[in-house]
């Protein structure tokens, strides 16, 4: 099998180098777009009927990126730009012959999913370094999506800038009107009379799953590749100055506990705290937080894990989400699972302010300083976590420095420190990213951990190579984690392991694709994973994920099948969902079938069923989700997961375990929303409720009313149910000085 894979890899590599003709380099002459200066502030209402808009110099020569790369779009798009001493204004007309009938928007969630919605977005590179971008996106209902991108690799999706957008819809299409304050943008100080910035516009028409751009890029890339961006010229921004944002909050809460040891039956509290954000200049930002609270953060979703390895729960707390990309370097799988499943992150913010079960631990104060420029990026963060009877007072520190090399490469270092009364854990890391050309890239890292308690030192490292074009994605990830490596403020999916995880995706859109009105591409793949125990060199896991059948549909739906022959050597027993499996060698084969519909429709679904052998028995798994969104103001999602064990483990266990949930989002508009979530897990007999009313009464100022409820089996008495109820009211106010 090893020789077969090597042969396939060599043959496909030869094919990719000899046949790929659709990847193109950035144009040496960048496409230009001119902004026009005005004196007055505009009324931002989505109509573009202020007389000043007639002074603008419109651009409409967009190019289609997907599916007909390089062709003239079937739907006209026009962009205009104005500016004054306070704002950069952008107006976009998105013509559509079907008018309102073609609009696809499923909900009003901020930072919405562009794969399920019409959208238009601006990528702005204020330093004009062709690497970094601030992205401002909206959909036909004026929902905001904004984030920061660095080398199209690290993304701060949860960065929330202060800006406005309004939209209107008509029988001829839809209009978006943006007003972005200069204080929100990051740009270099210049002595020139005018400035030119990197700039691109990306439009998605979801009904036909088409994508257009002002300055074109290959369809295997995205608009974040600023080396393909055009230029917006004629800008006269004010000199960058320091500005301060203060955001105090007031919170009152009521807590009730039943059958939980160490807790009062009832408790009430009033809490005051807040954050200060000081933009020292256009490059540097200092954030201060005191008596930090995350009551409005989404509750974690339960997961029934049947693998031997740790599940990475996403960070949901706003303070840690901002500038996460600077500190969050690491090696891990991409969203399409390319790169392999191995994950190494020297810093992972959920290790701060949360216990092992995800319950909050109070944070007294914290500070974060970040500076980004065309050449260097550096930052530091300090957090003081409050001590309690169950955990000592703990201090956390993380520092990061990286330097941009050449056009698209980077070298960096990171250090983390966790200090409490019993131990100090230190992790030091060096890492780099090299983009050899448009298709080839290499990401690597080396780090060492040390614990003063016991004087224990460990090491980890990884290198991840990618070759990505319109037709192929090929990767090889090599990783090593020693037995004693301990990133106390980080995350690893496995320990004491040497990982080898190559793979191939083939994206075929040629003339032999059948039923082209339905099928957009055929995408077979091969994902191979080998893991050896680092301390002994013994093979402990081997799997071949073979998918000869995978179809991407013109609608955005998909269907496919993956077969995965697997070898596992368990060095110790483990118990997935309470089913004990002894140590030893196991060979088994899993099959997975996937089917997903058009996610932009009013009713859509995703289903995958897994079946086959599992260690010494069988396991069938069903995952099903359905979205019902009759109008964008109302969306309801149901999810169901069932694991059926048959004669598995020491006791030949046969049982069903169900995990299901329902989530509803009800919005009067993008700024006033009620979100409810309920989840039940038959494995732990747990019921979780989360209901949150959110009103953004002015930009980035919120009123929240939150109710959380947890019911679960008591850990001390098996015949007793424990219960937690939390009712929270919180108001925050943002003031920009």
Residue ranges and their predicted role:
Residues 216-240, 380-435, 558-607, 621, ...:
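Outer-membrane beta-barrel transmembrane domain signature of Gram-negative proteins
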Residues 362, 370, 437, 442-737:
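Exposed, low-structure sequence patches enriched in small/polar residues
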Residues 248, 270-276, 284, 290, ...:
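Extended, hydrophobic alpha-helical segments in both membrane/secreted and soluble proteins
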Residues 19-397, 402, 412:
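Structural preference for beta-rich elements and adjacent junctions enriched in aromatics
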Residues 263-264, 307, 357, 387-392, ...:
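Alpha-helix capping and helix-loop boundary segments enriched in small/acidic/polar residues
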